[in-house]
Structure formats: C-alpha cells, structure tokens
C-alpha cells in the first residue's frame, strides 16, 4: 500500500474543525498562557495559597513562616471586632460591674419564652386628696384623751369654785351645759373611731 502524505494546511484545517476552532490563535492560546502566565492569575493563586495556609484557631491570621513570598500590596487588613470592657461611672470611681450584672439577671428573670421582656413596676394606689390615710387606733386615741383630761378637769374645778360663789342655781345650769357638751364630744369621737377602724361604736351611758 502506498501512503500519501496530506498537505500541512489540510491537516490543520481538519484539526480545527474537529476541535471546533475557527482561528489558529485560539488553538495556540492555551500553550502561550502556559508558557507566559497572566500576573493577575498569579495574584489570585497567591491569595488562594494564603487562604490555604491559615492556621486553625489563630483568628484568621496567615502563617508567614510557610508563605514567605506574599504580595503585600494585594493583601488587605481587616481589624477584628474588639469587645469594649465595662467602664466605670465618671466622677465617682465606683465600679458598676456588679450593678450591671444584677440588672442583667433581673431582665433575664423577667423574660418570657417568646423573647418578650417585661419590667416590673410597683403599682401606686391612687390616694384621694381629701381622704388621708391614718393609723390612729382606738387605744392611741384613748391615751390622747387621758392626757387631755387632767388640764380640763383643773379648769372645770376652778370654774366650779367661781360659780359657787354666785349661787347654786347658776352652778347647776353650768354643770348641765358642760355635761351636754362632753356627751356631744364623746359621740363625735366615737363616730370618728368607727369610720377609721371599722369597730363597734362606743356606747356612752
């Protein structure tokens, strides 16, 4: 059998059709890129290498011992977020760490399961301006009356002596008026004690 060598142009044309290439430069482009790589692609490769040499547990810092030829112009610095410590109150000098922790515990205890927090506020009962709360009991009221009676008795005795000099009828009239006033005062005191302490009224004989 005779072997016929095909021309070079026909072989190249057929190979381009098989590879789906329309231009000779497209077929030679991968070879040129392999011999002369693009500097941008090298930067990307260096960046990938730095990511591959990150030490676990070092907060994302690269290991400069393994990678010595880094392109520092392409590397960006990202500062880590720092937690600010609890500060002291100004012009006091007292550390408020304990107070803040107590507030956090109170807020945590007053939270529901769905994340809604509640604030416990003491309920103040409305007080009417005319009705003032008093803590006067019947015993303390009696002691106050017993302290007031001796000077009243002294004044009454002096008045009785003066009236006795004027006549018996006038003395009897004044004593009757004094007894009526005393009964009226006792009835008023009994009503006030009953309203304040809700006890049975004092029976005056």
From Swiss-Prot:
CDD domains: embe-CoV_Protein-I_like. The gene encoding this protein is included within the N gene (alternative ORF). GO terms for cellular component: virion component. The lineage of its organism: Viruses, Riboviria, Orthornavirae, Pisuviricota, Pisoniviricetes. It is found in: Virion. Belongs to the coronavirus I protein family. The keyword Acetylation does not apply. It comes from Human coronavirus HKU1 (isolate N2). Keywords: Virion. This is Protein I. Structural protein that is not essential for the viral replication either in tissue culture or in its natural host. It holds the Pfam family Corona_I. The gene is N. Transmembrane segments: none annotated.
């Amino acid at each position: 059998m005779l072997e016929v060598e095909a021309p070079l142009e026909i072989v190249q044309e057929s190979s381009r059709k098989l590879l789906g290439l329309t231009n000779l430069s497209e077929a030679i482009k991968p070879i040129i890129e392999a011999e002369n790589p693009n500097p941008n692609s090298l930067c990307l490769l260096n960046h990938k290498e730095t990511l591959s040499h990150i030490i676990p547990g070092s907060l994302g810092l690269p290991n400069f011992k393994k990678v010595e030829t880094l392109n520092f112009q392409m590397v960006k610095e990202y500062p880590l977020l720092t937690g600010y410590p609890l500060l002291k109150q100004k012009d006091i000098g007292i550390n408020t760490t304990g107070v803040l922790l107590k507030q956090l515990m109170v807020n945590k205890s007053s939270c529901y399961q769905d994340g809604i927090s509640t604030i416990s506020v003491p309920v103040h009962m409305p007080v009417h301006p005319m009705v003032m709360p008093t803590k006067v009991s019947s015993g303390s009221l009696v002691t106050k009356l017993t302290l007031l009676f001796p000077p009243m008795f002294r004044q009454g005795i002096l008045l009785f002596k003066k009236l006795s000099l004027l006549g018996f009828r006038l003395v009897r009239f004044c004593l009757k008026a004094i007894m009526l006033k005393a009964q009226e005062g006792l009835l008023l005191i009994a009503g006030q004690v009953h309203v304040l302490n809700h006890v049975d009224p004092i029976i005056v004989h």
